[in-house]
Amino acid sequence: MSAFTPASEVLLRHSDDFEQSRILFAGDLQDDLPARLDTAASRAHTQQFHHWQVLSRQMGDNARFSLVATADDVADCDTLIYYWPKNKPEAQFQLMNLLSLLPVGTDIFVVGENRSGVRSAEQMLADYAPLNKVDSARRCGLYFGRLEKQPMFDADKFWGEYNVDGLTVKTLPGVFSRDGLDVGSQLLLSTLTPHTKGKVLDVGCGAGVLSVAFARHSPKIRLTLCDVSAPAVEASRATLAANGIEGEVFASNVFSEVKGRFDMIISNPPFHDGMQTSLDAAQTLIRGAVRHLNSGGELRIVANAFLPYPDVLDETFGFHEVIAQTGRFKVYRAIMTRQAKKG
């Protein structure tokens, strides 16, 4: 996070307006502008662990990571700068949370790319902080309003639920495949062998559906789940609990917080970070897997068929197999061998 996003570049056109403000930055924080903008004081709240990692190095305790912001997170702020995400329910969760904490009279700025649907901020906040568009550049919109009424916020009302083959999946806004099991995960699940044993790590666990489906027909596996997303971590914990399955779940930027080695690592890795296309997480997953697999252990991932993962798998493990595929997706398998250890 060094170069500024288009949304941040639009904000910088108004940097003089923020010099005397005590600002809370929140939403889809894709760069480190919150740490670099000249203000009277700056705080940041994010639901994304990898964004918090970057910001906390520069902002210390003034950068916070959690599912739900608290009064302490917004203390003494008189301005909110909210970066609109690509997911409207996620924006509603975060904005209703934040506006329920900020005092009436707080200046509200909402910025985002037009393709993300930032225009819908006007309707969403009409009853609380009526917005006007104050700038348009870099295919982004910047909106301004003032908080007139605090909304009521109840995080419990944002939970969703669906069933997959008799399993209960708990979800929250911003979690991948919130409305049902995606095709890629279905393909990966079809390759998992019943009665598997050992330690299994689910990286980028989302709502936890891969892990609970695996554990149902392989009850002796020991599960560890991680994700960069606070909503995903909480959703996975709830999904495990709803199905009576035990497992450790925590926030991690791929392997950043993972300790130890595993017999299998499974993943449906993301290739979008907000509105941006990024292969970094998946490549970090593949290259880092050799440090977290036991000898003979395997990495098994599903990905869009067009993504360039075979070369990275071969560079890291020495070989790979495609064990299932459709027109759109492939399931890759790589085994931890002595050859892989040299990589």
From Swiss-Prot:
<dbReference type="InterPro" id="IPR002052">
    <property type="entry name" value="DNA_methylase_N6_adenine_CS"/>
</dbReference>
<keyword id="KW-0808">Transferase</keyword>
<dbReference type="InterPro" id="IPR023543">
    <property type="entry name" value="rRNA_ssu_MeTfrase_C"/>
</dbReference>
<dbReference type="InterPro" id="IPR013675">
    <property type="entry name" value="Mtase_sm_N"/>
</dbReference>
<keyword id="KW-0489">Methyltransferase</keyword>
<dbReference type="Pfam" id="PF05175">
    <property type="entry name" value="MTS"/>
</dbReference>
<comment type="similarity">
    <text>Belongs to the methyltransferase superfamily. RsmC family.</text>
</comment>
<protein>
    <recommendedName>
        <fullName>Ribosomal RNA small subunit methyltransferase C</fullName>
        <ecNumber>2.1.1.172</ecNumber>
    </recommendedName>
</protein>
<dbReference type="InterPro" id="IPR007848">
    <property type="entry name" value="Small_mtfrase_dom"/>
</dbReference>
<dbReference type="GO" id="GO:0003676">
    <property type="term" value="F:nucleic acid binding"/>
</dbReference>
<dbReference type="GO" id="GO:0052914">
    <property type="term" value="F:16S rRNA (guanine(1207)-N(2))-methyltransferase activity"/>
</dbReference>
<dbReference type="Pfam" id="PF08468">
    <property type="entry name" value="MTS_N"/>
</dbReference>
<dbReference type="InterPro" id="IPR046977">
    <property type="entry name" value="RsmC/RlmG"/>
</dbReference>
<comment type="subunit">
    <text>Monomer.</text>
</comment>
<dbReference type="GO" id="GO:0005737">
    <property type="term" value="C:cytoplasm"/>
</dbReference>
<dbReference type="InterPro" id="IPR029063">
    <property type="entry name" value="SAM-dependent_MTases_sf"/>
</dbReference>
<comment type="function">
    <text>Specifically methylates the guanine in position 1207 of 16S rRNA in the 30S particle.</text>
</comment>
<keyword id="KW-0963">Cytoplasm</keyword>
<keyword id="KW-0949">S-adenosyl-L-methionine</keyword>
<keyword id="KW-0698">rRNA processing</keyword>
